[in-house]
Amino acid sequence: MKTQMNYAKEGIFTKEMQIVAQKENLSKDFLLENIACGKIIIPANINHKSLDPNGIGFGLRTKVNVNLGVSNDCVDYSEEMKKVELAHKFDIEAIMDLSNYGKTSRFRDELVNVSKAMIGTVPVYDAVGFLEKDLKQIGAKDFLDVVYHHAKSGVDFMTIHAGINSRAAHIFKQSKRLTNIVSRGGSVLYAWMMMKDAENPFFEYYDDLLDICLKYDVTLSLGDALRPGSTHDASDGAQISELIELSLLTQRAWDVGVQVMIEGPGHMAINEIEANMQLEKRLCKGAPFYVLGPLVTDIGAGYDHISGAIGGAVAAASGADMLCYVTPAEHLRLPNLEDVREGIVATKIAAHAGDIAKLPKERARDDEMSKARQEIDWEKMFKLAIDGEKAKKMFNERRPDDLNSCSMCGKMCAMNTMNQILKGEDVSLA
């Protein structure tokens, strides 16, 4: 089976590439060149028939991913499907099913069947439930069985923590971190490695993993098991050593035509973000970078969507290609629908703010909004806003008597004042 990367290397412009080119207003040659060399990916499993393809990477708009899924404390698949509907409403490009309890295949199959967004999973989360074995009883190649099952079901990309091999694990042990390993998948694999005194199975059998990805054109999202879970741990030896391992794994995937993106931090002081984006691009030869936040402070509990949006905007402006949303419930509980909405909007704002910095053409919508404000065209403002529904609701909660202003400024509306005076009219504030 050929992947999007293989087709690009042969100069074949697939229907998925055509859709992305139209969405991004990019040329055929630009896309072919950058998909062929790995700087742009189009996650598109051959079995995901409902997919509306999107590209991630160089020269493209920053994409947003929404996480959802059940846990052993909250098993309500109907609510998770409502989160999917909400993600679709906001035109989210990627959805990850992070369910880590029970038999998850039915929900995942439904997700692939109904979702136009690309679907991602973390197969190691599903290992215990799928295999019906406790962690210590799972064999190295058992993990690949889970990967195969997910790939066959139509998942477009998978987080695989192949970089935390014995070398990276050794450096982690010497790192004296405050928060150790905060990646769920990474912590599970590390525990398995320690209990079995064995190499990371995804690293040991990486070629077998690539064969699965090739068969279904699954994009590898190389997970950062050693991402910093606190600003204290950011940019340390453990994080960077794993990134080096991921760069080597990226090249091996590219050599056979498997698409790759790299996952990144995490928690990180705002002054370290740009350098980390540049380092990933340098080490991984331009492979798309998919970051969680980064959260720029550790004390924003209840408001981590704000901390994540601040870091995400800086990351996107500095080269990050996809942002994983962060909700107000981060670090506290499974998010509800309102948390998901707040996280989506905050992250879309961050992604767009970054795009204005790196893709000047993306300012056009902002200019239209500014024009609508100058013209005091409320309906146009609501239409252009990222969350126009909330904007309209807030406006109507204290609707002004004179629609040439809002309830904040009333007759002292600066826009209305300037519109009148520049037309040669007198201004009356009485």
Swiss-Prot record:
<comment type="subunit">
    <text>Homodimer.</text>
</comment>
<comment type="function">
    <text>Catalyzes the synthesis of the hydroxymethylpyrimidine phosphate (HMP-P) moiety of thiamine from aminoimidazole ribotide (AIR) in a radical S-adenosyl-L-methionine (SAM)-dependent reaction.</text>
</comment>
<feature type="binding site">
    <location>
        <begin position="224"/>
        <end position="227"/>
    </location>
    <ligand>
        <name>substrate</name>
    </ligand>
</feature>
<dbReference type="InterPro" id="IPR002817">
    <property type="entry name" value="ThiC/BzaA/B"/>
</dbReference>
<dbReference type="GO" id="GO:0008270">
    <property type="term" value="F:zinc ion binding"/>
</dbReference>
<feature type="binding site">
    <location>
        <position position="161"/>
    </location>
    <ligand>
        <name>substrate</name>
    </ligand>
</feature>
<feature type="binding site">
    <location>
        <position position="263"/>
    </location>
    <ligand>
        <name>substrate</name>
    </ligand>
</feature>
<feature type="binding site">
    <location>
        <position position="267"/>
    </location>
    <ligand>
        <name>Zn(2+)</name>
    </ligand>
</feature>
<keyword id="KW-0456">Lyase</keyword>
<comment type="pathway">
    <text>Cofactor biosynthesis; thiamine diphosphate biosynthesis.</text>
</comment>
<keyword id="KW-0004">4Fe-4S</keyword>
<dbReference type="InterPro" id="IPR037509">
    <property type="entry name" value="ThiC"/>
</dbReference>
<feature type="binding site">
    <location>
        <position position="406"/>
    </location>
    <ligand>
        <name>[4Fe-4S] cluster</name>
    </ligand>
</feature>
<keyword id="KW-0411">Iron-sulfur</keyword>
<dbReference type="GO" id="GO:0016830">
    <property type="term" value="F:carbon-carbon lyase activity"/>
</dbReference>
<feature type="binding site">
    <location>
        <position position="125"/>
    </location>
    <ligand>
        <name>substrate</name>
    </ligand>
</feature>
<feature type="binding site">
    <location>
        <position position="413"/>
    </location>
    <ligand>
        <name>[4Fe-4S] cluster</name>
    </ligand>
</feature>
<dbReference type="Pfam" id="PF01964">
    <property type="entry name" value="ThiC_Rad_SAM"/>
</dbReference>
<dbReference type="GO" id="GO:0009228">
    <property type="term" value="P:thiamine biosynthetic process"/>
</dbReference>
<protein>
    <recommendedName>
        <fullName>Phosphomethylpyrimidine synthase</fullName>
        <ecNumber>4.1.99.17</ecNumber>
    </recommendedName>
</protein>
<dbReference type="GO" id="GO:0051539">
    <property type="term" value="F:4 iron, 4 sulfur cluster binding"/>
</dbReference>
<keyword id="KW-0784">Thiamine biosynthesis</keyword>
<feature type="binding site">
    <location>
        <position position="96"/>
    </location>
    <ligand>
        <name>substrate</name>
    </ligand>
</feature>
<comment type="similarity">
    <text>Belongs to the ThiC family.</text>
</comment>
<keyword id="KW-0949">S-adenosyl-L-methionine</keyword>
<dbReference type="GO" id="GO:0009229">
    <property type="term" value="P:thiamine diphosphate biosynthetic process"/>
</dbReference>
<keyword id="KW-0862">Zinc</keyword>
<dbReference type="InterPro" id="IPR038521">
    <property type="entry name" value="ThiC/Bza_core_dom"/>
</dbReference>
<feature type="binding site">
    <location>
        <begin position="183"/>
        <end position="185"/>
    </location>
    <ligand>
        <name>substrate</name>
    </ligand>
</feature>
<feature type="binding site">
    <location>
        <position position="331"/>
    </location>
    <ligand>
        <name>Zn(2+)</name>
    </ligand>
</feature>
<feature type="binding site">
    <location>
        <position position="67"/>
    </location>
    <ligand>
        <name>substrate</name>
    </ligand>
</feature>
<feature type="binding site">
    <location>
        <position position="409"/>
    </location>
    <ligand>
        <name>[4Fe-4S] cluster</name>
    </ligand>
</feature>
<dbReference type="GO" id="GO:0005829">
    <property type="term" value="C:cytosol"/>
</dbReference>
<keyword id="KW-0479">Metal-binding</keyword>
<keyword id="KW-0408">Iron</keyword>
<feature type="binding site">
    <location>
        <position position="290"/>
    </location>
    <ligand>
        <name>substrate</name>
    </ligand>
</feature>
